[in-house]
Amino acid sequence: MIAKKIISPFAKTDLSDASKWYEKQQKDLGKRFLNEMKEAFEIICQTPTSFPIRYDDYRIYYTKTFPYSIHYQYIDYKNEIQIKAVFHTARNPQIWEQRIF
């Protein structure tokens, strides 16, 4: 069964900021970024336990084209994923960790 997806306000801001930045770099690149994120969310929802646990019970999924990682929790008894961050892989991980710890 496909898991329900909840995107945190922080992750929504991450998505918005990144797509705007990519759109400024090249026309339609922001849209391509958002499309890849949508595909990634679908994959995570279909197979939420397939990706490694990185911190405590937070899992991480690395996108294919863009250098981003999606940090999420899978709540098994609710069959729900909670997306906490959409994070550029070159950024300091302590920034997103401060959101959850």
Positions of the model-derived regions?
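Arg/Lys-rich, positively charged N-terminal/basic patches that mediate binding to nucleic acids
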Residues: 1-34
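Generic recognition of well-ordered alpha-helical segments
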Residues: 13, 17, 39-42, 46
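Short, hydrophobic secondary-structure boundary micro-motifs
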Residues: 31, 52-54, 95
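Basic/aromatic recognition patch in beta-strand/loop cores that engages polyanionic ligands
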Residues: 39, 46-80
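Enriched for short, Lys/Arg-rich terminal
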Residues: 73-101
